[in-house]
Amino acid sequence: MAVTTRLTWLHEKILQNHFGGKRLSLLYKGSVHGFRNGVLLDRCCNQGPTLTVIYSEDHIIGAYAEESYQEGKYASIILFALQDTKISEWKLGLCTPETLFCCDVTKYNSPTNFQIDGRNRKVIMDLKTMENLGLAQNCTISIQDYEVFRCEDSLDERKIKGVIELRKSLLSALRTYEPYGSLVQQIRILLLGPIGAGKSSFFNSVRSVFQGHVTHQALVGTNTTGISEKYRTYSIRDGKDGKYLPFILCDSLGLSEKEGGLCRDDIFYILNGNIRDRYQFNPMESIKLNHHDYIDSPSLKDRIHCVAFVFDASSIQYFSSQMIVKIKRIRRELVNAGVVHVALLTHVDSMDLITKGDLIEIERCEPVRSKLEEVQRKLGFALSDISVVSNYSSEWELDPVKDVLILSALRRMLWAADDFLEDLPFEQIGNLREEIINCAQGKK
């Protein structure tokens, strides 16, 4: 049976971030391996930097060793106390592991201001140490349990290699993707969501990955009315002079609960393929049928094959009841129209305590999982239909971890679009295939 830590996710993240963003790997647990400090040192010496966490009835305290414990050798020790979400620290200074853990106080000089006595299940501190750590003035703390962790890099060489391989695999899959039944050459994905959610940034991020450097073709910003005021359909080249990829990302004016956002009627003109690229939206009224950017008889290739609702992960909790009602109403109308849709959570890297290491297994991350459940609860999306990304915003260089999230989300959208194409009425598919065959024969 695997040995697990007593730390909550939140407390573990606070400690990780406080001590250099390291990943904590459990080496020793008193309640499992025994409260014998000699055994502790046998397991924990020569392991690199370590973090000892002590649990009492009222406190979580401990010691961080910046260097590896070695028998008889001094290491720099930092003491800490964790209370709720606040952490305080005090530098104990140089100390041998034997004296810190009360293993042989006769052979080495014993510090009188802090000792961990596993055999008697207590921590001994002087008043000054208690005061520096912000603890109540009680010189002895009973130990319920204690754990020692090895502090490792959150992204070791093995993990980085795995991320790079996954990125390579995703790029290959997206480059060679073919829409279901060859009914269209390019899938059209509409990015829809509140103003400032990150729709244009997601397009820029996708383009950046395929261009091999960070790009900003679509303007982004934080205006309350949004930056995107035109309908844009973006084809993306594979590299600077490469062929166009088999998908088009469509950007639009953001949704607003008040005046200034995208008209609901315009959404369905977009879905049906009636609106041309670069149409200037009018927030007060939808497109007129006699407008020069209105397409009278759009074909399947002009239609939207998947809608991706884009939400800022840090803003979901602040959605007004009007915004929630608007999104739910649009979703119902999409379902009635047979249009598949997914959700995209952006800005997850700006959430509290999220580290780069968390982005590798982002959906296992507790705060992100909580956000996914919030989207499910408030807006009705299935958890399996929600992707998580970290867009490029201020970075100068590409990051393979971010790339994997972006490419995975895009692949999920293409899978959803295939579902839409496969679900088209049989008669419509038959007519389309006949048109495709006739067109191909006419080119010969």
Curated annotation (Swiss-Prot):
Gene encoding this polypeptide?
IFI44
| The protein's name in its UniProt record | Interferon-induced protein 44
Q: Which organism is it from?
A: Homo sapiens
- What is expression of this protein induced or repressed by? By alpha and beta interferons, but not by gamma interferons.
Protein's UniProt keywords contain Cytoplasm:
yes
Any one GO cellular component localisation term in the record = cytosol
According to the record, the segments passing through the membrane are: none
**BP GO annotations:** cellular response to virus; immune response; response to bacterium; response to virus
Q: Which InterPro entries match?
A: P-loop_NTPase, TLDc_dom
The record's principal subcellular location, in a coarse class, is: cytoplasm
